[in-house]
C-alpha cells in the first residue's frame, strides 16, 4: 500500500481526499492548523525546511501539496507578498528538495485555474475554445503568478532528478456542492465535483508521468478548461458534472 502524504490537508480539498484515499492508500495529513495530533494528522509548518525534513517520513511514496492561505488582491503589499511567497513558492521548492533527498517518487502540486485566469471570465473561456495547458499562462494576480512559478520549479526537478511532478490546476471545490451551485452561476462551469476530485488525484497518484500540467474540472457543459490531456495521459475519468448534480436536487 502506497504511503501518501497530504501537506496542507486541513482544508476542504484535503478533507475530501483524506476521507476517500484512505480506502486504497496509507494517508497522513500534515498541516500547521492541526491542533490535536493523531496517528494520521500531524502539525507541521511547511515553510520551515528543517521541520519538514524531520517530520515527513522517508518511506513516503507520494506527496500532495495543498498549501494555501487566503488572498484577495491582484497586487499585494510587501508583507502579504512575503507571506504568499513563503507559502506558494518557497514551501513548494522545499517540499521538492525533501522529496529529492528522501527519493520520494512523486509530488502532486495543487495549482490553480488562476494560472490562466486572464483568459476566463465568470467561468467562460474568452478564447472561443477551451483553455489548454499549452496556452501561455497569463494570471491576473500575484496568486496565479506564484502558482505558475511553482509549476515551473517542478519542471526543473523533473528534468534534473528522478522526481515525478504533476500539477493540477484545480477549478472550484466548495464544501457543499449543491448549495454552492444555487448561489454561484460560475460554478456550473468551473466545479470539480468531489467524486471527480478523488478520481483525478487517484489517477495522478497511479499515472506513469514524469512531468505534466492538467486542469482539474468536471466534464461540465461550457467548462472553460480542456481536460483531454488529463484523460489521455493520467487516465482521468470524470463521472459527476454539474448537470447531474442539479438534476438530483
Indicate residue ranges for each PLM-predicted region.
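N-terminal Rossmann NAD(P)H-binding glycine-rich loop of SDR-like oxidoreductase domains
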Residues: 4-23
Amino acid at each position: 500500500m502506497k504511503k501518501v502524504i497530504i501537506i496542507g490537508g486541513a482544508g476542504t480539498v484535503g478533507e475530501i481526499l483524506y476521507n476517500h484515499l484512505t480506502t486504497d492508500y496509507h494517508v497522513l495529513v500534515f498541516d500547521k492548523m492541526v491542533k490535536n495530533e493523531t496517528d494520521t494528522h500531524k502539525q507541521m509548518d511547511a515553510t520551515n525546511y528543517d521541520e519538514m525534513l524531520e517530520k515527513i517520513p522517508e518511506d513516503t511514496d507520494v506527496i500532495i501539496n495543498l498549501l494555501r492561505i487566503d488572498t484577495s488582491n491582484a497586487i499585494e503589499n510587501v508583507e502579504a507578498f512575503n507571506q504568499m511567497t513563503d507559502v506558494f513558492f518557497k514551501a513548494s521548492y522545499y517540499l521538492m528538495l525533501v522529496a529529492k533527498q528522501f527519493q520520494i517518487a512523486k509530488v502532486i502540486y495543487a495549482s490553480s485555474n488562476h494560472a490562466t485566469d486572464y483568459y476566463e471570465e465568470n467561468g467562460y473561456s474568452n478564447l472561443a475554445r477551451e483553455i489548454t495547458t499549452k496556452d501561455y499562462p497569463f494570471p491576473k494576480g500575484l496568486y496565479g503568478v506564484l502558482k505558475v512559478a511553482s509549476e515551473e520549479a517542478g519542471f526543473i526537478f523533473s528534468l534534473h532528478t528522478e522526481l515525478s511532478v504533476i500539477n493540477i490546476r484545480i477549478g472550484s471545490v466548495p464544501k457543499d456542492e449543491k448549495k454552492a451551485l444555487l448561489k454561484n452561476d460560475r460554478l456550473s462551469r468551473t466545479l470539480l465535483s468531489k467524486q471527480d476530485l478523488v478520481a483525478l488525484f487517484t489517477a495522478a497518484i497511479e499515472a506513469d508521468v514524469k512531468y505534466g500540467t492538467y486542469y482539474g474540472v468536471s466534464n461540465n457543459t461550457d467548462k472553460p478548461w480542456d481536460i483531454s490531456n488529463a484523460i489521455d495521459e493520467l487516465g482521468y475519468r470524470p463521472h459527476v458534472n454539474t448537470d447531474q448534480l442539479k438534476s438530483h436536487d
